[in-house]
Curated annotation (Swiss-Prot):
Protein name in UniProt: Uncharacterized oxidoreductase YKL107W
Main subcellular localisation: membrane
Database matches in InterPro entries: NAD(P)-bd_dom_sf, SDR_fam, Sec_Metab_Biosynth_Oxidored
Family indicated by similarity: Belongs to the NmrA-type oxidoreductase family.
Gene Ontology cellular component list: endoplasmic reticulum; membrane
Enzyme class: oxidoreductase
GO molecular function annotation: aldehyde dehydrogenase (NAD+) activity
EC number(s) stated in the UniProt entry for this protein: 1.-.-.-
Annotated compartments: Membrane
Domain of life: Eukaryota
Length: 309
C-alpha cells in the first residue's frame, strides 16, 4: 500500500471484549455483504443496535439483532428513498458507515438512470444518502457528549485524484481502472469536503486495502476461475473481513478520534495522510459535478423503475 502515516493522530487499541457497544446505534449502508456484513455481525453480536441496507439479507442467525432494509443502491431514486426512509433511525444514530462498492466492469455498464454502474454504486449512493441525512444525523440521541460519526470506506490516501469532469465515464475512452479510481478519488473528496461542511458530525475515511470479498465479481466474473484464484491469493496474503471488522469496531469506539474529522485510516487502523493532489479546487469540482450527475439521473429516471427492484 502506498499511503503515509499521519503522526498527529493516534488511538488506544483496547481489547474489543472490554468495550461496551450497547450504547451504539449504527446504520451500515451496504451492510449485507463483504466488509459491511462483517462489521454489522461484529457489532450485532456485541449488543449494538444495527440497521443494514442492501439487496439480500444473509444473516438469519442474527435477524433478531439486525434490522434489514432492502434497497437497490445503484439507483439514485432508491438512494433518495432510503435517505428519507423511516426504517432507518438517522436522528438516533451514533454511527453511519458506508461500505457499498463494486469494481467497474471491463465493458462500461449503465444503470436504468443512465449512470455508469460502479460510480452509481461505489460513490453516488454514498454522496446522496450522506448529504441528505448529515444535518439531522443523531439529533435525537439520548446521550450527546460526543458527535455522531460517519465512516466512508474506499481507498483514500493513495494519491488518486481522478477526473471530476468525467464522473460518468462517458467523455473519454472507457477504462475500468480509470473509472474505479474516479470513485476512489470521489469518496476521499467526500470525506475532505465534509470536514468543513458538516461541523455537527465527525467524518472519516477508511482504507481496508485488499480483503477477500465479492467486490471484484463485477470485474472478474462471479465464481469464475480467475475470480477464484484471485480471491484465494488475497485470502492467503491479506487479512480477512472478520479481522478487519474487529479493528474497525474498536476504532469507531475510540474517544481519541473525537473532533478529528477528515482523518483517514489504513487497513490496520493507523491514521494516514490524505492524497496531496485532492486540493480544495479539485474537491469542490467533485462535489459540484456529483450534484449535476444526480440531477441528470433523476431526469433520466425510467417510469418503470420500481423501489422494489
Amino acid at each position: 500500500m502506498f499511503w503515509k502515516k499521519d503522526p498527529t493522530v493516534s488511538w488506544e487499541r483496547k481489547n474489543i471484549n472490554d468495550i461496551d457497544f450497547s450504547r451504539f446505534n449504527v446504520a451500515i449502508i451496504g451492510g449485507t455483504g463483504g466488509l459491511g456484513r462483517a462489521i454489522s455481525r461484529e457489532l450485532a453480536q456485541r449488543n449494538a443496535r444495527v440497521t443494514v441496507v442492501g439487496q439480500t439479507f444473509r444473516d438469519e442467525d442474527l435477524k433478531d439483532k439486525i434490522n434489514f432494509v432492502k434497497a437497490d443502491l445503484s439507483l439514485v431514486s432508491e438512494c433518495k428513498r432510503i435517505s428519507h426512509s423511516d426504517e432507518i433511525p438517522y436522528e438516533e444514530l451514533t454511527h453511519l458507515i458506508f461500505t457499498t462498492g463494486i469494481f467497474a466492469s471491463r465493458q462500461r455498464q449503465a444503470t436504468s438512470e443512465g449512470l455508469e454502474k460502479d460510480m452509481a454504486v461505489s460513490y453516488l449512493s454514498r454522496y446522496i444518502i450522506f448529504h441528505d441525512v448529515a444535518k439531522r444525523l443523531g439529533i435525537s440521541r439520548t446521550k450527546k457528549d460526543d458527535l455522531p460519526k460517519v465512516f466512508i470506506a474506499g481507498f483514500p490516501g493513495n494519491g488518486q485524484v481522478g477526473d471530476p469532469d468525467d464522473l460518468n465515464s462517458d467523455e473519454k475512452k472507457y477504462s475500468a481502472y480509470a473509472t474505479h479510481m474516479n470513485t476512489v478519488a470521489a469518496n476521499e473528496s467526500l470525506v475532505i469536503d465534509a470536514k468543513d461542511r458538516y461541523t455537527n458530525i465527525d467524518t472519516f475515511g477508511l482504507n481496508p486495502g485488499l480483503i477477500k470479498t465479492n467486490i471484484r465479481n463485477n470485474l472478474l466474473g462471479s465464481d469464475t476461475y480467475l475470480s477464484r484464484i484471485t480471491e484465494w491469493i488475497i485470502s492467503w496474503t491479506c487479512q480477512s473481513a472478520e479481522t478487519y471488522a474487529k479493528t474497525i469496531c474498536t476504532l469507531i469506539a475510540s474517544p481519541a478520534i473525537e473532533s478529528r474529522s477528515g482523518t483517514m485510516f489504513s487497513n490496520k487502523g493507523d491514521a494516514i495522510l490524505p492524497s496531496p493532489g485532492l486540493t480544495k479546487d479539485v474537491v469542490e469540482k467533485f462535489m459540484e459535478n456529483s450534484e449535476l450527475l444526480v440531477e441528470k439521473a433523476l431526469r433520466n429516471q425510467s417510469p418503470f423503475t420500481s423501489s422494489n427492484e
